[in-house]
């Protein structure tokens, strides 16, 4: 019993020795942030000047930028212009379709309905059908004008070659003179050939030329 009593206080003595050691370690850990905290104030005295000054400048610049935007009206001028342009396009299209009620295209409605149904296009609005007929009419007129220009170029080159040939045979009489007078009457006429039409359609990506034949 005496031995047990002697051991118990010894253990009790050793435990407080360990506790202060742990306490000393904890104090050493706590002292490190204290030393860092003591070092920070010296840096904090300088840091606020460098950090807060741009913040104040940014706060001062932001209202100025807003004021400049309001003065220039960038938020209120650019966007409405875009919307007005879109509205103007829609308005012109509506007015154009309204004018199609009184318009009768050169292409008959029966022929237009036939080719639209043949291509698989279904539409109930007659104004849209007339608009498609007008575009087809415009396309045909452009192709005809281009073909006419090609025919003029072709006839001009052929007339130049015929005049040189006629100058060489000048002085021949009789039936040759009668034939030449008939040809002179045909010079004022323009004849559109398939070659002229194929050359005009080739500009629009349509090829009408016959494939080359090889034996």
Curated annotation (Swiss-Prot):
Can you supply a Gene Ontology BP term from the record? transcription initiation at RNA polymerase II promoter
* Bias type Polar residues, positions: 23-42
Keywords on this record?
Nucleus, Transcription, Transcription regulation
- What GO cellular-component annotations does this UniProt entry give? cytosol; nucleus; SAGA complex; transcription factor TFIID complex
| Record's compositionally biased regions (Basic and acidic residues) | 58-73
Q: Does the keyword ATP-binding apply?
A: no
One molecular function GO term is: promoter-specific chromatin binding
Family matches, as InterPro entries: TAF10
- The region called Disordered is annotated at 1-77
Q: Which residues form the Histone-fold domain?
A: 58-203
Q: What is stated about domains?
A: The histone-fold domain (HFD) mediates heterodimerization with TFIID-specific components TAF47 and TAF65 as well as SAGA-specific component SPT7.
What this chain does, per the entry, is described as: Functions as a component of both the DNA-binding general transcription initiation factor complex TFIID and the transcription coactivator SAGA complex. Binding of TFIID to a promoter (with or without TATA element) is the initial step in pre-initiation complex (PIC) formation.
Can you state the subunit structure given in the record? Component of the 1.8 MDa SAGA (Spt-Ada-Gcn5 acetyltransferase) complex, which is composed of 19 subunits tra1, spt7, taf5, ngg1/ada3, sgf73, spt20, spt8, taf12, taf6, hfi1/ada1, ubp8, gcn5, ada2, spt3, sgf29, taf10, taf9, sgf11 and sus1.
Family in the record: Belongs to the TAF10 family.
Question: This protein is called what?
Answer: SAGA complex/transcription factor TFIID complex subunit Taf10
Source organism of this protein record: Schizosaccharomyces pombe (strain 972 / ATCC 24843) (Fission yeast)
Gene name for this UniProt entry: taf10
């Amino acid at each position: 019993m005496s031995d047990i009593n002697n051991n118990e206080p010894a253990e009790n003595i050793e435990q407080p020795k360990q506790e202060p050691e742990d306490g000393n370690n904890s104090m050493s850990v706590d002292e490190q942030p204290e030393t860092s905290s003591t070092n920070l104030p010296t840096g904090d005295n300088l840091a606020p000047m460098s950090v807060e000054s741009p913040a104040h400048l940014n706060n001062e610049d932001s209202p100025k930028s807003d004021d400049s935007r309001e003065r220039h009206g960038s938020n209120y001028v650019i966007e409405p212009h875009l919307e007005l342009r879109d509205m103007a396009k829609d308005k012109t299209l509506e007015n154009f379709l309204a004018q199609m009620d009184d318009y009768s295209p050169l292409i008959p409605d029966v022929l237009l309905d036939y080719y639209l149904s043949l291509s698989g296009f279904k539409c109930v609005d007659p104004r849209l059908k007339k608009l498609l007929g007008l575009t087809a009419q415009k396309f045909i007129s452009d192709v005809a004008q281009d073909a006419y220009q090609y025919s003029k170029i072709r006839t001009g080159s052929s007339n130049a070659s015929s005049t040189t040939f006629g100058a060489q045979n000048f002085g021949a009489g009789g039936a040759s003179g009668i034939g030449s007078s008939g040809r002179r009457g045909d010079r004022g006429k323009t004849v559109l050939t398939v070659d002229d039409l194929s050359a005009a359609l080739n500009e629009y990506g349509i090829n009408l030329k016959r494939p080359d034949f090889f034996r």
